[in-house]
A protein has these predicted regions:
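A short secondary-structure junction signal
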Residues: 91-95, 122-125, 130-131, 152-157, ...
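N-terminal non-catalytic cap/leader segment that marks the start of a structured domain
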Residues: 1-109, 276-280
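Catalytic-pocket segment enriched in acidic/His residues
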Residues: 42-49, 53, 63-64, 173-296
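A generic local secondary-structure boundary/capping motif
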Residues: 69-72, 99-102, 126-135, 140-141, ...
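Short, structured patches in soluble enzyme cores that scaffold and shape functional sites
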Residues: 114-116, 123, 130, 137-147, ...
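A gly/proline- and charged-residue-enriched helix-loop-helix capping module
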Residues: 102-123
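Residue "hotspots" at secondary-structure boundaries inside conserved domains
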Residues: 72, 78, 104, 133-135, ...
Length: 296
């Protein structure tokens, strides 16, 4: 864990050095699970931040040591929803279909439910699924819910946001197109992999509606660039919509959807085995994943 852009530190060591050890906090299990940490709520978050700020230098983790690697910053997602927040992407889709944007898109922030058990972390390989010939990526911001609730208002939404990370919404475009031609989905066209990382930056650092530069690169070549603040739908809109008459939970992940021109589909380009995708978002970091070999 890190704070204020400093190097990562040993959270367990910091917590013990600060003299904490409340047996009511799930017996300390949250020390090895970011989801449990999020579920504990704001009071614990403040204690953790204080312990980190007071940590001596010998708790800093050497990221250059052999064998060090970043893991997925969220060890378990409670759920995964991926929205379609950017009008620029929707307009490109309508142009490809020679149609117009559906009226309902302007009425509510639509989303699909993804596979929250198929989450990759930084530098994890994305296996090429045996059922697709057209693999793609999508550059997105992901928001992690911190405090659950129901019927959340736009005005109170910021209190429910834990933080943000970079998200790669891997997509099997041929399968996705066939599924959605049957008026449902996507399903297998998306469910095989979603990547998150390299870290979660909390909302107290970025604000609840951050406007951040977003860049996607494949094999070092820039494919697209955008700003998260250009989204038509805000995080408050998404939280208010999802929580209308139903509960949302700590650790729920909301993907923003990709901006126009920040995926292969919008650019008429496709991935191939061995490609390295780098997605970078200002103030969060760079998420890198490589595409695995195509199955025989």
């Amino acid at each position: 864990m890190a704070i204020d852009g400093d190097p990562p530190i040993d959270l367990i060591g910091c917590w013990e050095a600060a003299g904490h050890g409340d047996p009511d906090l799930q017996s300390g299990q949250w020390l090895t699970s970011s989801l449990l940490l999020i579920e504990e709520g704001p009071e614990l978050w403040r204690l953790v931040a204080d312990a980190i700020r007071a940590a001596p230098a010998d708790f800093i983790v050497d990221t250059k040591v052999d064998g060090f690697r970043w893991l997925c910053p969220l060890d378990r997602a409670a759920s995964l929803r991926d929205f379609l927040a950017f009008e620029s992407h929707v307009l490109r889709g309508a142009e490809r279909r020679k149609s117009t944007v559906p009226e309902y898109w302007y009425e509510a922030p639509v989303y699909y439910k993804g596979n929250h058990r198929a989450i990759l972390g930084p530098d994890d390989e994305c296996e090429w699924p045996s059922f697709t010939h057209r693999l793609d990526f999508e550059l997105e911001v992901a928001m992690i819910v911190g405090v659950g609730g129901r019927d959340i208002t736009h005005e109170s939404a910021s209190a429910h946001i834990f933080g943000f990370t970079v998200m790669n919404d891997f997509s099997a475009r041929d399968v996705q197109a066939r599924e959605m031609s049957a008026w449902l989905g996507p399903a297998k066209g998306k469910d095989f992999a979603t990547a998150l990382g390299p870290c979660i930056v909390t909302a107290d650092e970025l604000g609840s509606e951050p406007d951040l530069e977003m860049v996607c690169r494949v094999n070092g070549d820039e494919w697209g660039r955008a700003r998260s603040g250009d989204a038509h739908w805000r995080w408050a809109d998404m939280l208010a919509h999802v929580s209308d008459g139903e509960d949302v939970y700590p650790g729920d992940v909301y993907g923003s959807g990709t901006p126009g021109g920040c995926c292969g589909l919008d650019l008429g380009r496709e991935l191939k085995p061995g490609d390295v995708i780098e997605l970078e978002i200002e103030s969060i970091g760079l998420l890198r994943n490589q595409i695995g070999p195509r199955p025989e």
